[in-house]
């Protein structure tokens, strides 16, 4: 459960406790990344800072969010943009969205990428917590469809969409 959910359970005489998040343990096991080696292996420019793009892990979510995130590239030409790709989605899927944009695709290297990123654009979800635990400044993004938004607005009573704001 999340910290703010405890009163809900108490109302129904359920003894519930927030015990933390398993990511906290996972992050303590991370090994530092050798910047020079990582940049060379992944053909990244050592002279440019990295902005990580984490558009989500589900096909529909990535389709909806990545296009919006890519619009920032033209605003910050002095940075290099790197997408942390979901291993469950094929490279061709990302390439069909990215087109000719000057952006790099990385699979299975999200934590290493975040360790070297100066900032990140992150779709709301677990990735926001991972990004925060690695001390990377982030902009949290989400775009739902209009019907879902209006239903959620009536039902959900939290101020934030970001796990970082809900947990930390």
Regions found by a protein language model. Give the residues of each.
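Nucleotide-activated sugar donor-binding and catalytic core shared by glycosyltransferases
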Residues: 1-168
């Amino acid at each position: 459960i999340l910290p703010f959910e405890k009163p809900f359970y108490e109302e129904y005489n359920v003894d519930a406790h927030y015990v933390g998040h398993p990511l906290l343990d996972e992050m303590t096991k991370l090994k530092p990344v050798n910047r020079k080696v990582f940049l060379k292996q992944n053909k990244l420019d050592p002279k440019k800072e990295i902005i990580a793009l984490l558009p989500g892990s589900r096909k529909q979510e990535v389709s909806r969010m990545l296009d919006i995130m890519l619009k920032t590239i033209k605003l910050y030409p002095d940075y290099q943009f790197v997408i942390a790709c979901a291993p469950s989605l094929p490279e061709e899927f990302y390439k069909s969205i990215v087109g000719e944009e000057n952006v790099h695709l990385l699979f299975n290297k999200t934590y290493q990428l975040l360790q070297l990123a100066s900032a990140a654009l992150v779709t709301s979800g677990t990735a926001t917590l991972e990004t925060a635990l690695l001390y990377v400044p982030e902009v949290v993004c989400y775009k739902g469809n209009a019907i879902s938004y209006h239903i959620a607005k009536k039902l959900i009573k939290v101020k934030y969409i970001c796990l970082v704001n809900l947990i930390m």
